[in-house]
Amino acid sequence: MSTIRCDIVSAEQEIFHGEATFVVATGELGELGIAPKHAPLITRLKPGKVVITTVNGEQLDFAISGGILEVQPQVVTILADSAIRADTIDEVAVRKAKEEAERILANRGETIDVAKAQQQLVEAVVQMQALERLRRTVKH
């Protein structure tokens, strides 16, 4: 079975390093599927999910808040603004962050940072979607 090395890193830490048979991420122009020996590519990533299929067939789900994806013949590198494995997401904290961002955006005043609140909302929604996908996968 052919594999490709995959690395996911954020400003804070290395999130994943290992061999994969397939990687899925959301680029600016849509969803990308990357298999071993994929043509070289570089693109910006939208906030969303990254799914890595490991050599044993396991699917690992990650939530990212955006970043850059680079594909070389033997390696896929994802430089994420922030990234988290779906199975480590704190659902209560994410729900609170989402509610707080929505509250801030609903009560816009001159002193709030709208872009920051919007980014927090996007990150919370992406993490909740990753949790939901993980739950569906575990049930099957």
Curated annotation (Swiss-Prot):
Organism field: Xylella fastidiosa (strain Temecula1 / ATCC 700964)
Protein task: Produces ATP from ADP in the presence of a proton gradient across the membrane.
Entry membrane topology: Peripheral membrane protein
Molecular-function annotations in GO: ATP binding; proton-transporting ATP synthase activity, rotational mechanism
Family from the record: Belongs to the ATPase epsilon chain family.
PANTHER family: ATP SYNTHASE DELTA/EPSILON CHAIN (PTHR13822), ATP SYNTHASE EPSILON CHAIN, CHLOROPLASTIC (PTHR13822:SF10)
Cystine residue pairs: none
One annotated Gene Ontology cellular component of this protein: proton-transporting ATP synthase complex
Keywords in alphabetical order: ATP synthesis, Cell inner membrane, Cell membrane, CF(1), Hydrogen ion transport, Ion transport, Membrane, Transport
The encoding gene: atpC
Protein name: ATP synthase epsilon chain
Highest taxon, organism lineage: Bacteria
Localization per Swiss-Prot or TrEMBL: Cell inner membrane
Keyword Transport annotated: yes
NCBIfam families tied to this protein: ATP_synt_epsi, PRK00571.1-4
Subunit details: F-type ATPases have 2 components, CF(1) - the catalytic core - and CF(0) - the membrane proton channel. CF(1) has five subunits: alpha(3), beta(3), gamma(1), delta(1), epsilon(1). CF(0) has three main subunits: a, b and c.
Gene3D superfamilies in the cross-refs: ATP synthase delta/epsilon subunit, C-terminal domain, F0F1 ATP synthase delta/epsilon subunit, N-terminal
InterPro entries in UniProt: ATP_F1_dsu/esu_C_sf (IPR036794), ATP_synth_F1_dsu/esu (IPR001469), ATP_synth_F1_dsu/esu_N (IPR020546), ATP_synth_F1_esu_C (IPR020547), ATPsynth_dsu/esu_N (IPR036771)
